[in-house]
Each structure stands twice: as structure tokens, then as C-alpha cells.
């Protein structure tokens, strides 16, 4: 809604680039109303300044090109528990390592929002997207690498085992 209202105010010629929380539920409307979006790549969120730099790079690319860069996105057909979203451990850690490697290799600016699963609306859930000439191929590559549902299922210890384990440490 916010990006749509900004777009209404500034018109189609004014570039709009925004940064998003890693847990954002990214909608097709958000992608359509902006010239570019980039998400945080860490949870806990320790990359605010880095994400601002990425947004500035996207704006610079947009201004240099004189139009919106090609963008492609893929939505996951499942939700990711918040407990599986920490980028300090698997599976999110390896997902973002793959994102960074593809980002560097391809020049496509990639983002992966894992979504906020407690939201209740149709477009709630994880989305990967990218900006750049090879966006479709690179997004498809990342999507295939990180979209296996079984990888994202958190492992829960039974209560008794959790107590025993906590006493050991």
C-alpha cells in the first residue's frame, strides 16, 4: 500500500527504490510499483547500512539505465517458520551464502524475503527476486537451490530432551 501511494504522488517517471525487512511479505504490487527493491540479508538484522548501500546501488543503476531494470521473482508455495529464518545457522545461512555467490557471479542484485508467516493474506510467504539483465535465469537458479520445503522444517527437541540438553551446557 505504501509504495502504491508514493507512486501515485510522484508519478511513473520518478524512480522508487526501497529496502525491505528480511521478513517482509513481498507482493506483486510492491514489485510493480517500485523501480527496485532490496531486502536485508541477515536475521538478526545487522546489515541495515549494507542494505542501504545496496539500495543506493540499485538507484544508481536505475538512473544510469534511464528506465527500470529487468526484474524477475518467484514465490515459494509454502511458509517458512520464523524459527528457521536465522541466517546464523542452516538452512537460512546456506541460502544466503548461495544468494551472495550468485549475486557476485552474475551482477544480478538478488533478494530473498522469507516472509512473516503469522500474517494472514494471500501473498504471505517467501519470495526471491532479482534485478538485472539475467534476472530470470539467476532467480530460477536460486529458487531451485533454496525452495525445497523439507529443508525449512525446524527440528524441535522433545521437552525432556531439551531440558537434558540445557543442563549439559
Roles of regions detected by a PLM:
Residues 20, 38-42, 75-80, 132:
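Short, structured patches in soluble enzyme cores that scaffold and shape functional sites
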Residues 34-38, 74-78, 121-126:
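Short acidic (Asp/Glu) and glycine-rich catalytic loops that position anionic groups and cofactors
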Residues 43-51, 83-91, 120, 131-138:
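Catalytic cores of large soluble enzymes that bind and process phosphate-bearing ligands
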Residues 168-169:
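Conserved small/polar residues in nucleotide/adenosyl-binding loops
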Amino acid at each position: 500500500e505504501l509504495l502504491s501511494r508514493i507512486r501515485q504522488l510522484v508519478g511513473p517517471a520518478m524512480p522508487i527504490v526501497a529496502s525491505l525487512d528480511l521478513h517482509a511479505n513481498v507482493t506483486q504490487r510492491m514489485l510493480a510499483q517500485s523501480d527496485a527493491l532490496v531486502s536485508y540479508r541477515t536475521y538478526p538484522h545487522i546489515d541495515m547500512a549494507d542494505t542501504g548501500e545496496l539500495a543506493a546501488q540499485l538507484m544508481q543503476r536505475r538512473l544510469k539505465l534511464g528506465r527500470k531494470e529487468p526484474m524477475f521473482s518467484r514465490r515459494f508455495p509454502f511458509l517458512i517458520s520464523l524459527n528457521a529464518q536465522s541466517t546464523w545457522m542452516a538452512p537460512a545461512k546456506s541460502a544466503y551464502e548461495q544468494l551472495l555467490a550468485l549475486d557476485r557471479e552474475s551482477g544480478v542484485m538478488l533478494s530473498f524475503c522469507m516472509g512473516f508467516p503469522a500474517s494472514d493474506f494471500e501473498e504471505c510467504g517467501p519470495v526471491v527476486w532479482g534485478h538485472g539483465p539475467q534476472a530470470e535465469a539467476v532467480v530460477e537458479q536460486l529458487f531451485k537451490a533454496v525452495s525445497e520445503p523439507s529443508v525449512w522444517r525446524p527440528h524441535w527437541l522433545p521437552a525432556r530432551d531439551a531440558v537434558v540438553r540445557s543442563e549439559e551446557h
